Amino acid sequence: MNLIINDKTASSSVGQTIGKAARLNHAHVGYVCGGHGLCQACYITVQEGADCLAPLTDVEKAFLSPRQIAAGGRIACQATIAKEGTVKVLSRPEEVRRMVFSNPFQLIGYAADMGKDTAQQIVPGVQNLIGRIQRGEMGGKDALGDMIESIQGAAGLVVEAIQQGPMALPIPFKEQIADLISKLPLPQIQLPSISLPQLPSISFPQLPFSLPKLPFSLPFLPQQPQATASLEKVTITVQPPAKD
């Protein structure tokens, strides 16, 4: 099975939902409600291989507008891979990211369409939710456990990314943000010059009296004679002994 999420290949198998495959591959597809189709955080657009997926579920028919369905919209936690082939999808966060850095003005119409779709599907969505609650599909420990598992999975991804460093966080346009920050001119901060105050000069007061002179004089110390030595010239004459 060849599953491509946001232009990145993800391992998957037949019978698996796209939402489950996205979680296992750490792909940027949201999930909060535990795969019950309530939050629609995992909304995706199928760009290729729609025939490889199972038909729309009742949950998708209730929460997706006709416009979204016609555009290839699916809820990843509900869209099951039915047969082998190539399926290429685009998540909503990635779609928004591409708009931000290609044509931000598209976001105005995109947000308006999202609001219109949500308002249009409020009644069918609530009816579907009530029906599932009445059938016992949304109650009990299983549903709560699914939600807790999803939240724990999301928290685990964040913790893992933090351990790898700030830039490993699953932010949809972190590379572009980092690039923009690196190009921002840093302000030049000039520290003010600090001059220390001049210390005042301190003069000690003059004594009001003078020291008296000594009434006696020290005795004269005679100089000791210096010892001198001289070497006089000495002449030594050696005479040979007299002959008999």
From Swiss-Prot:
GO terms for biological process: photosynthesis. GO terms for cellular component: chlorosome. Its cofactor is [2Fe-2S] cluster. Binds 1 [2Fe-2S] cluster per subunit. This is Chlorosome protein I. InterPro entries: 2Fe-2S_ferredoxin-like_sf, 2Fe-2S_ferredoxin-type, Beta-grasp_dom_sf. The gene is csmI. It comes from Chlorobaculum tepidum (strain ATCC 49652 / DSM 12025 / NBRC 103806 / TLS) (Chlorobium tepidum). It is found in: Chlorosome. Coiled coil: none annotated. Keywords: 2Fe-2S, Chlorosome, Electron transport, Iron, Iron-sulfur, Metal-binding, Photosynthesis, Transport. GO terms for molecular function: 2 iron, 2 sulfur cluster binding; metal ion binding. [2Fe-2S] cluster binds at residues 33, 39, 42, 77. SUPFAM superfamilies: 2Fe-2S ferredoxin-like (SSF54292).
